[in-house]
Amino acid sequence: MEFALLGWAEADPTLRLDYRRFSYAGKFVTGGTGVAVIRGDAAERAADDAPAVESDDETAADTDPESLASLPDGVAESEFADEVLAAITFSPDRTDSSTLKIRYLTVRDDLRGDGKQLGPQLVAFLTSKAAAAGYDRIAIAVNNAFSYHALYKVGFTYTDRETGLAELVLDRPIGEPAVASQSGYQRGLDVFREREGLSAAEIEFLSDHSNAVPPRLLSSLRQS
């Protein structure tokens, strides 16, 4: 896999993703944010087309590439960015320029929950780049328990704040992971538990993580 920073917000990079495979694909063509990606080569792509294995991050998808909807007339596969496995957009926080705000994070549908931790790995990569760029903190707002749990693996913790869109805000210092506590982790999960319209997978996940401690950091972030 290759991690690549396509540019910061001032460079106005854009990326055209296959909207059939990536959530929020339209957010990557509008500009105004930085973009980073994980790419895979052809061999990895072939392996990735094998059935996904469910992990504790979110329900694995089993999308068959051959079953994708047909593209409309005038749109060709070649117009989409090739070999992208995950992508992220980001820009300075509107109220604090020392904080980098992650705007959108998306993983190709057949790779979600396959155990490779592509989303957390891409966030960790971006955090290292943000440190070199002089940011003090990095933040993200999430709307589901799976993403919330995954962000704890790269040193984010719940801030006890929500956005106007009912998303939970997590952040961490740039230089080191935030100190996670069981009580703080569970407070965020409790917010999701109180919501209506949860999927069966979300209900099961929240039940399984009742009284659980925060997940371990990715191995690359753990202190020796």
Task: Describe every region a protein language model picked out.
Residues 150-151, 170-174:
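Short secondary-structure transition/capping segments
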Residues 1-84, 95-101, 131, 158-161, ...:
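Haloarchaeal acidic low-complexity proteome signature biased toward cell-envelope/secretome components but also
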Residues 107, 114-128, 153:
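Conserved acetyl-CoA-binding loop-helix of GNAT-fold acetyltransferases
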Residues 75, 87-92, 124-127:
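Short secondary-structure capping micro-motifs at structural edges
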Residues 142-165:
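Conserved active-site alpha-helix within GNAT-family acetyltransferase domains
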Residues 128-143:
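Conserved GNAT acetyl-CoA-binding A-motif
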Residues 89-91, 95-114, 168:
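Conserved acetyl-CoA binding element of GNAT-fold acetyltransferases
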